[in-house]
Amino acid sequence: MNKNEELDEDELLKKCIICPPVPKALKKYWNNRYNLFSRFDEGIWLDYQSWYSVTPEKVAVAIAKSVVDFIQPELIIDAFSGCGGNTIQFAKYCPVISIEIDPIKIAMAKHNLEIYGIPSSRVTFIQGDVLDTFKSLQFAKDYRSLVFMSPPWGGPSYSGKTVYSLNDLNPYAFDVLFKEATRISPYVAAFLPRNTDVKELAAYGSIHNKPYITNFLFEGYAKAICCYFNMKGAIARKI
């Protein structure tokens, strides 16, 4: 990358970071900013999409503690890592490979990790398509690894559906993601909408490997779920 390209990327990054006054559509997320990142005022970077898609900090902490307590992973693969909400918490326990297709979000994630004091050596960022990247991560089979997936839900409109189908995930349906993830590790966790069809999720388990679901509540309202596969015991935590 030459100097002009670096300047262009810096300029694009500055344009993508949402600063006050925030757009009207993001006001409720702005009012909730300290739940997204407790250290927000230290300079957290978020683009428009990240405001409504990042995992709230307490939820990310609970997920990280659950999987670490249960399987003590040597490596965590954070698919669809975005601006780093989950990566920050995972990296406190073990090395992380973060997969994100958007270079702007990767730049934001690296910055946000610095704010939380995460050494750059702790996280390997891979810019690319998740399924293509999964194929290059077969070495992870040699480690006690976890594949964590927080695929795009399709924006805030998901909440208007009575039941959210796993086929509505974009760009890949859940069955495709799950198949490729389990080729890397038997331990898989998926962060999904609160109204996800649990009957569809149950189809990915068996008598000996039932999926376990944590329902995350905020101020008494369900916000999202995390489904754990092959991890009996990685259950609900108070947040």
Swiss-Prot record:
Keywords: Methyltransferase, Nucleus, S-adenosyl-L-methionine, Transferase. GO terms for cellular component: Cajal body; cytoplasm; cytosol; mitotic spindle; nucleolus; nucleus. Gene3D superfamilies: Vaccinia Virus protein VP39. Optimum pH is 8.0. Coiled coil: none annotated. Its EC number is 2.1.1.-. One of its GO terms (biological process) is 7-methylguanosine cap hypermethylation. GO terms for molecular function: RNA cap trimethylguanosine synthase activity. It catalyses: a 5'-end (N(7)-methyl 5'-triphosphoguanosine)-ribonucleoside in snRNA + S-adenosyl-L-methionine = a 5'-end (N(2),N(7)-dimethyl 5'-triphosphoguanosine)-ribonucleoside in snRNA + S-adenosyl-L-homocysteine + H(+); a 5'-end (N(7)-methyl 5'-triphosphoguanosine)-ribonucleoside in snoRNA + S-adenosyl-L-methionine = a 5'-end (N(2),N(7)-dimethyl 5'-triphosphoguanosine)-ribonucleoside in snoRNA + S-adenosyl-L-homocysteine + H(+); a 5'-end (N(2),N(7)-dimethyl 5'-triphosphoguanosine)-ribonucleoside in snRNA + S-adenosyl-L-methionine = a 5'-end (N(2),N(2),N(7)-trimethyl 5'-triphosphoguanosine)-ribonucleoside in snRNA + S-adenosyl-L-homocysteine + H(+); a 5'-end (N(2),N(7)-dimethyl 5'-triphosphoguanosine)-ribonucleoside in snoRNA + S-adenosyl-L-methionine = a 5'-end (N(2),N(2),N(7)-trimethyl 5'-triphosphoguanosine)-ribonucleoside in snoRNA + S-adenosyl-L-homocysteine + H(+). Monomer. Interacts with mug174; both proteins are required to maintain Cajal body integrity. This is Trimethylguanosine synthase. The lineage of its organism: Eukaryota, Fungi, Dikarya, Ascomycota, Taphrinomycotina.
